[in-house]
Amino acid sequence: MVMNMNHLHIFVKVGEKLNITEAAKELFISQPAVSKAIKNLESSLQLKLLIRDKHHGLMLTDIGKEILLLARQMKGIESKIYQVANRENKLLNGKVKIGSFPAVSTNIMPQAIAAFRSNYPLIRIELIEGTSDQIKGWVEDRTVDIGIAASPFEPFENQLLCNDYMVAVIPPQRDELKLEKHVDLETYQDDLIFCKGGHEIAMSNAFSQYNIELKENLTVQNAETLINMVKNNLGIGIISNFTLSSVPHQLIKKDIFPRVTRDIGVIAHSFEEITPAAHEFVKVLKAVVI
């Protein structure tokens, strides 16, 4: 059984896009060439990797999903081999795929990418944004080389970037809160607006520790929406200080009780196994944050 690496690369793209046309466009080859490569790969493996469903279109078979995960690992190893060779020849190139949540993309990434490009102009960077849970999933299935996510980091290896904590933002109409040193979450539990962003476990643990009932009266997907909700006096916003710093606003910020903290860090299956390019990006990232 001889496997063509080019066919494997094409399969990875098709497996990610689940669309022959889109895969062909991104690979800059014809649709028939893509279809032929998939057919040849299936023939060499004697497996059916993809099926076409009447309602859902192109889908991976169960074994196709397993092969896709292994194929991504093989691509990573191939890239690492070239990068190790290039590093030895004083010429680091390739591509780094990074999973990041929006606040990191706003607060940290511009400076980190600028610093990285000044040292490694031949390395391409692909930034994929999502929630912390999505990023952990992308690291797990090797869609990205590294991810930047909020704690807890298990089961991945992690390198700490910074500490973070939850704060409250209060509506301008709530005069009784302006003089408060902090917002007591138990007292105002019916007024809280939450923003999804990787702090859910930390919040849940704090509420459990202090025997406070966690009432998710209103939960939004992003910081901008939370700010607008608070502006319109719909409640008290609970958001991470790091995320809040990435959004312009004129609301009053208050500490909360009980105090809720979390960490933000870089995660990977193994930092020893990531490519030289990804390893260098982690070093630059940590230098920028410090």
UniProtKB/Swiss-Prot annotation:
Transmembrane keyword on record: no
A GO biological-process term: positive regulation of gene expression
Residues of the HTH lysR-type domain: 1-61
Record GO terms (molecular function): DNA-binding transcription factor activity; sequence-specific DNA binding
UniProt entry keywords in alphabetical sequence: DNA-binding, Transcription, Transcription regulation
Keyword Transcription: yes
UniProt DNA-binding residue ranges: 20-39
Domain of life: Bacteria
Membership in a protein family: Belongs to the LysR transcriptional regulatory family.
Name listed for the protein in its UniProt record: Uncharacterized HTH-type transcriptional regulator YoaU
Organism of this sequence: Bacillus subtilis (strain 168)
Lineage: Bacteria, Bacillati, Bacillota, Bacilli, Bacillales
